[in-house]
């Protein structure tokens, strides 16, 4: 604990937030959170706006709700340390990069497969922690890497014909970059926030940072459409409330309170749900090889996360 955090006044025991009630039902919260986040890519595609525009409003529309929750946390548990706030802002830079890449991937390979590719962050988190933080690389993660790579190859469409997507090969490359940037975001956010009781505060800071960075990214690329339009911004508001607020907070609260093996199943609900929902709602039709590739990646994620509690995903 840093001197700044230890100096914070201990809150009275009677103070609680509405999130504490959900934390007492972690299985329900985790499943609901995973299924909520599964709609993320679908809402981005339905909004049909440029990638940076989707990133800006996804974060900006979430800010008032996150601010209210963050203030409730502060009243209950005290002020977060300045160092924690700085780390959350740095994490927001990588979150903005992740969203920009993810939204491009959706356009190239579809919402379902883009979400599966983004979930390779589970493997990247372990690899980055091993390379940069000198944490032990679990054997299961090492064994999962060939499965994930095989799945990525199949999704790219280089094997067989009739691969779904505008440009599946480029989509795979950008999708892997999505997973890498999201892994960096999660590691930095984890490094700066050891207090699991306060998930909304760091997410507010990271979302505010990501809003500003997304504006900076989108301006030179000509991807900003800042005048609200309907129904696009209805979808973006739904995206902000579902993925950025409700889904993230439910997952953040529940996973640390679940048995490690169960977290693996919960985390795979989101990409599986995204693929199925994209097929049903958007009419996406990955070919057999791409579905096999998605299955290989999901199997790799299960293998990599069994026995540990990986960080949550909100992509």
Residue locations for each model-derived region?
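Membrane-interface helix-cap regions at the ends of transmembrane helices
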Residues: 39-42, 62-81, 149-165, 209-232, ...
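Glycine-/small-residue-enriched transmembrane alpha-helix faces in small-molecule transporters
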Residues: 1-57, 90-93, 101, 150, ...
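Juxtamembrane helix-entry segments on the extracytoplasmic side of multipass membrane proteins
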Residues: 24-26, 48-56, 79-86, 157-181, ...
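Hydrophobic transmembrane alpha-helices of multi-pass small-molecule transport proteins
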Residues: 7, 128, 137-160, 182, ...
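Cytoplasmic-side transmembrane-helix entry/capping segments in multi-pass membrane proteins
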Residues: 26-30, 83-90, 137-150, 172, ...
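Hydrophobic alpha-helical transmembrane segments of multi-pass membrane transport proteins
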Residues: 32-39, 43-46, 69, 89-108, ...
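Transmembrane alpha-helices of multi-pass small-molecule transport proteins
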Residues: 2-9, 49-97, 122-125, 147, ...
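Specific alpha-helical transmembrane segments that line the substrate/conduction pathway
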Residues: 53-64, 103-141, 178, 260-279
């Amino acid at each position: 604990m840093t001197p700044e955090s230890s100096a914070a006044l201990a809150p009275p025991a009677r103070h609680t937030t509405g999130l504490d009630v959900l934390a007492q039902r972690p299985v329900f919260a985790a499943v609901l959170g995973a299924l909520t986040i599964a709609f993320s890519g679908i809402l981005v595609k339905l909004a049909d706006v440029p990638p940076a525009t989707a990133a800006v409003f996804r974060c900006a529309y979430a800010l008032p709700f996150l601010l209210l929750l963050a203030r409730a946390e502060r009243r209950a548990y005290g002020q977060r340390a300045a160092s924690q706030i700085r780390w959350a802002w740095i994490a927001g830079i990588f979150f903005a990069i992740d969203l920009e890449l993810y939204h491009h991937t959706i356009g190239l390979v579809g919402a379902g497969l883009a979400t599966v590719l983004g979930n390779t962050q589970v493997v990247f988190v372990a690899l980055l922690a091993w390379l940069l933080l000198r944490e032990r690389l679990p054997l299961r993660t090492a064994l999962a890497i060939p499965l994930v790579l095989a799945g990525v190859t199949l999704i790219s469409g280089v094997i067989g014909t009739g691969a779904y997507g505008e440009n599946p090969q480029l989509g795979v490359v950008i999708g892997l970059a999505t997973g890498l940037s999201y892994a960096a975001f999660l590691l930095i956010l984890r490094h700066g926030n050891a207090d699991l009781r306060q998930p909304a505060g760091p997410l507010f800071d990271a979302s505010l940072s990501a809003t500003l960075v997304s504006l900076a990214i989108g301006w030179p690329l000509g991807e900003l459409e800042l005048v609200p339009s309907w129904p696009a911004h209805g979808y973006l508001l739904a995206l902000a409330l579902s993925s950025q607020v409700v889904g993230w907070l439910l997952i953040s609260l529940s996973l640390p309170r679940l048995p490690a093996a169960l977290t693996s199943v919960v985390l795979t609900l989101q990409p599986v749900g995204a693929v199925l929902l994209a097929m049903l709602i958007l009419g996406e039709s990955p070919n057999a090889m791409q579905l096999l590739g998605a299955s290989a990646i999901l199997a790799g994620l299960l293998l990599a996360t069994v026995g540990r509690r990986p960080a949550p995903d909100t992509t």
